[in-house]
Amino acid sequence: MSEMTPREIVHELNRHIIGQDKAKRSVAIALRNRWRRMQLEESLRVEVTPKNILMIGPTGVGKTEIARRLAKLANAPFIKVEATKFTEVGYVGKEVETIIRDLTDVAVKMTHQQAMEKVKFRAEEQAEERILDALLPPARDSWGQVEQKEDTSNTRQIFRKKLREGQLDDKEIEIDVAAPQMGVEIMAPPGMEEMTNQLQGMFQNLAGDTKKKRKLKIKDAMKALAEEEAAKLVNQEELKEAAIFNVENNGIVFIDEIDKICKRGESSGPDVSREGVQRDLLPLIEGSTVSTKHGMVKTDHILFVASGAFQVAKPSDLIPELQGRLPIRVELEALSSNDFKRILTEPKASLTEQYIALMKTEDVDIEFTEDGITRIAEAAWTVNETTENIGARRLHTVMERLMDEISYDAAEQSGAKFVIDAAYVQARLGDTIEDEDLSRFIL
């Protein structure tokens, strides 16, 4: 779990996302509150529930990007889902409880990787011994007991040194390794994923643990044996318990496109993929117990962050009970021409950096001038204003159109240099931007 302060979290988000300070502050505080809660005494910790967040803002302003970056910063079980993928319990489609099952799978995988990392050094030592045994089988007496001889020990040390220096990497040896589990792949009907997982687990258990002789290069054998030895050192039951504890106390669920499950107008009949899904989300967000293949998971202290553009629907169109369970509202602002200019240059691995690096692979140099970047930003903003406003995503469309000719001819123009200035942008995009009908279809 991340121990970063809210200021550090915002600073890290600023490296990738331009603007939206209110949203960054809200998620930073929510993330820090997870850590604060874990410092409390048990009796008080149980009473502190997370303050769930609803992010409201037009498309392409950074809602989903905040979620993606938060996942990397959180160092906690995190899952992002689309609200439109679910249907009400009892109908064909995914039930909302699969969110918690998937989150638990993420936590188990994450905890497993951490546990394997902790025992990595011991596992590599044991793998090294097994490889040395294969290279230098120990001498045995007439009773079958291993004999300890001085010269054998010295030879073993020489081989150990060579092994560590990588001199034996390409030598092939024959070793016993655990046979890969041949899992039976079963296509799950919608809503029956849990039953399918249980069936697959049953088929895998029938195979049991079998050893198989394989001829491998020493560097590949080292990797395979280290993984096998690490798996022996990890207690799977303790690992599952730790993963469930991590989900229950640090888990974060990001629900995107929540505005798409609002009820629109007066309609008769069951609304299984809209209001029905909202009703099913209520117990998850409020706190309930979900059965997973790893054990029972309580959702009382899982943090839920929902987001939506709310261009057609309004937050008040959500059912009142769900509105009450998302107490923190954050509005994200539409992006300006100046924001677009900053997006093109300031973030780590910005769009301009990406195109420069891509063309560099063909030995073509690209240089974006200040006035060229300003013109690109203005072009994207103008098209957004005159047609549909799709936010920063418009920059991808404009940049692709701008770089189209250079990208196509780059392989034949090795060593060339192109300067993308205002005049170049105007020449490539000017007519398209000024003609509203053209920009509607091309940009």
Swiss-Prot record:
InterPro entries xref list: AAA+_ATPase, ATP-dep_Clp_protease_ClpX, ATPase_AAA_core, Clp_ATPase_C, HslU, P-loop_NTPase
GO terms of biological process kind: protein unfolding; proteolysis involved in protein catabolic process
The superkingdom of the source organism is Bacteria
Molecular function GO labels: ATP binding; ATP hydrolysis activity; peptidase activity; proteasome-activating activity
Q: What Pfam families is this protein classified in?
A: AAA, AAA_2
- Binding-site list for ATP: I18, G60, V61, G62, K63, T64, E65, D256, E321, R393
Keyword field: ATP-binding, Chaperone, Cytoplasm, Nucleotide-binding
What GO CC terms are in its UniProt record?
A: HslUV protease complex
Q: Does the keyword Phosphoprotein apply?
A: no
- Respond yes or no to whether keyword Chaperone is given for this record: yes
Q: Where in the cell is it found?
A: Cytoplasm
Q: Which family does it belong to?
A: Belongs to the ClpX chaperone family. HslU subfamily.
Role summary: ATPase subunit of a proteasome-like degradation complex; this subunit has chaperone activity. The binding of ATP and its subsequent hydrolysis by HslU are essential for unfolding of protein substrates subsequently hydrolyzed by HslV. HslU recognizes the N-terminal part of its protein substrates and unfolds these before they are guided to HslV for hydrolysis.
Quaternary structure? A double ring-shaped homohexamer of HslV is capped on each side by a ring-shaped HslU homohexamer. The assembly of the HslU/HslV complex is dependent on binding of ATP.
Q: What is this protein called?
A: ATP-dependent protease ATPase subunit HslU
**Originating organism:** Vibrio parahaemolyticus serotype O3:K6 (strain RIMD 2210633)
Q: List the lineage, top down.
A: Bacteria, Pseudomonadati, Pseudomonadota, Gammaproteobacteria, Vibrionales
